[in-house]
Amino acid sequence: MYKTFFFGWLAGVLLTTITGPLGLFIIWRRMSSFGDTLSHSSLLGISFAVLLNIHPFFMVIITILLFGMLIIWLNYTTVLSLDTILGIIGYSFLSLGMIIINSISNFQKNKLTNYLFGNLLEVTYIDIVILIISCVSILFVLVWYWDLMLLTTINSDLAKIDGVNVLKINSILIFLITLTIGIAIKFIGSLIAISLLIIPAATAQRFSTSPEKMAFFSVIIGIISITWGILMSVYYNLAISPTIVFCSSIVFVISNLKKIL
């Protein structure tokens, strides 16, 4: 039993090491709608995986990476706003996923539950290994391009003047966010995966004086939320992923009490 809890907690902690820093860019660039649409569009990958009887994790990754590439391509080749593009592609993916779900049996539909709501208490040793490799790879790329991502976020025009390939940097950032959400979906579910990026990062703003400190505090707040959420879900027999998000929201409210009062 303790091994199960530890693996679940470790998976959550590993996730926060990438969701924390990347969540900052979602807040700074006001991309929460992008992450939310991405999470919901993953339903297409999940439903395809169940229909074809293949591992959902890889199908979800493929689907959302396709989603991300379509966003990048349309954003730079059309005059449509990003919100419009997100709406068109997101609802197209979501509706196709719902069509597939309605065509599969009730037995197969039961397999969708974990990917819709997640379950950190079903994490295996193989999941941990995959997660470690994924997190290290994403963190390496993020650290390598950190300064350029900050510059393009603060002032893309200035970045262009300095010779920065803004399209390349933005594409890398979208790719990292897309991949991170795809990984997070396996553990905390597609319906609330984006919350693990947004809430800790928003909370960290209250305690930070630099981007690096904000990234650090975002990870710490994420770990606190994961730990608290797992303990509450086990003690009170609650759904683990929503409990973690709820605990994260409470931390956010507490951090803003002084400002509210």
From Swiss-Prot:
This protein's record includes keyword Kinase: no
Principal location class: membrane
UniProt keyword terms in alphabetical order: Cell membrane, Ion transport, Membrane, Transmembrane, Transmembrane helix, Transport, Zinc, Zinc transport
CDD domains hit by this protein: TM_ABC_iron-siderophores_like
Source taxon at top rank: Bacteria
Pfam family, any one: ABC-3
Subcellular location, record wording: Cell membrane
Residue stretches spanning the membrane: 5-27, 48-70, 85-107, 128-150, 172-194, 215-234, 238-257
SUPFAM superfamilies: ABC transporter involved in vitamin B12 uptake, BtuC
UniProt membrane topology term: Multi-pass membrane protein
InterPro entries: ABC_BtuC-like, ABC_TroCD
Gene3D superfamilies listed in its UniProt record: ABC transporter involved in vitamin B12 uptake, BtuC
An example Gene Ontology biological process: response to zinc ion
Any one GO CC term of the record: ATP-binding cassette (ABC) transporter complex
UniProt similarity note: Belongs to the ABC-3 integral membrane protein family.
PANTHER family: ABC-TRANSPORTER METAL-BINDING PROTEIN, HIGH-AFFINITY ZINC UPTAKE SYSTEM MEMBRANE PROTEIN ZNUB
Described purpose of this protein according to its UniProt entry: Involved in the high-affinity zinc uptake transport system.
Protein name: High-affinity zinc uptake system membrane protein ZnuB
Organism name: Buchnera aphidicola subsp. Baizongia pistaciae (strain Bp)
Gene name per UniProt: znuB
